[in-house]
A protein has these predicted regions:
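Membrane-embedded transmembrane alpha-helical bundles that form the catalytic cores
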Residues: 1-296
Length: 298
């Protein structure tokens, strides 16, 4: 079930909107979390466990860093300036070690799943015999969106370490931040400070937001299904039989391919933005997507 599928737009979203609106205000965030996990499970099945593991680790690291800051505040009570400086440096080192531990675990899992097989295959080719054959993750599937929520988790832990945000004490809030369904598969990577003001409010649906959201969603569908998919027919025809065409046609196909890629990604981003808009959730980072789209596709 992709963002541009009929099931997502005409079944999943309406049911989610209805459940969200009927739920008590304080439970609406949990409703979004439940539907986010359902969406991810429909996409990846049991690979949901990676998202759950990342959520648990991120939450624990955030709490750990907060506890260290609390201990530091208590430890410096009644001390002079010089002693406070020594204690502060000591706790900064402790916090840095905790942060590095969390980052290494997350990047270790991501690197193993995404790149270990690539490196071992090339090393085996280079040396002429299998390298680390027993460690290759051939039977492991790649969780959808793991790069996005891993980097988002690292950003959250880093912000807690630097004191720019307070760590969440309720794990469902951390889980919703990392797993909110409109951005779990394609991004964008949001900072906690960009979404916190709207993600957890649980405010009721507003007519204007629903209308604007669906207009944005259908505009994204138009880009994907009418422009990108139609462009793909021409591009594939030329690229699959390039020997039958002259240079001008091949150049036109290459330009068409760039347009296809841009419209696919731009259309998907419009659907994502529109999905968030339905609930009145529109992170600051979403407003800068146009520059991001251009850079990513070109």
């Amino acid at each position: 079930m992709g963002y541009h599928s009929i099931i997502y737009i005409f079944l999943f979203l309406p049911v989610c909107l209805l459940a969200y609106q009927l739920a008590p205000e304080k439970w609406r965030g949990r409703v979004l979390l439940a539907f986010s996990w359902i969406f991810f499970y429909l996409l990846s099945g049991k690979l949901l466990v990676y998202l759950l593991g990342t959520t648990l680790l991120t939450h624990c690291i955030g709490i750990w860093l907060t506890l260290l800051k609390t201990e530091e505040a208590k430890a410096v009570e009644g001390m002079d300036r010089k002693q406070k400086k020594v204690i502060k440096v000591e706790y900064q080192k402790k916090g840095r070690r905790v942060l590095i531990l969390g980052i290494l675990i997350l990047l270790g899992v991501l690197g193993y799943l995404k790149y270990f097989d690539f490196f071992t295959t090339n090393l085996s080719y280079l040396f002429g015999h299998p390298v680390l054959e027993g460690w290759r993750p051939e039977k492991l599937l790649m969780p959808i969106g793991i790069s996005f929520y891993t980097l988002q988790a690292i950003g959250y832990m880093t912000d807690v370490y630097w004191g720019t945000i307070q760590a969440e004490t309720e794990i469902w809030r951390t889980a919703l931040f990392l797993g909110f369904f409109p951005q779990i598969m394609e991004g964008p990577i949001a900072r906690y400070s960009d979404v916190a003001d709207t993600l957890y409010t649980g405010k009721p649906l507003e007519y204007r937001n629903v209308v604007d959201g669906y207009v944005r969603i259908f505009w994204g569908l138009f880009k994907k299904m009418v422009i990108a998919d139609r462009m793909a027919l021409m591009v594939n025809q030329v690229f699959d039989h390039y020997a039958d065409y002259h240079g001008a046609v091949i150049l036109a196909a290459a330009i068409g391919y760039v347009i296809q890629l841009y419209m696919e990604f731009s259309g998907c981003m419009d659907i994502i933005i529109g999905s968030g808009k339905l609930f009145g959730i529109c992170p600051v980072s979403y407003t800068h997507l146009r520059a991001h789209e251009t850079g990513r596709n070109l």
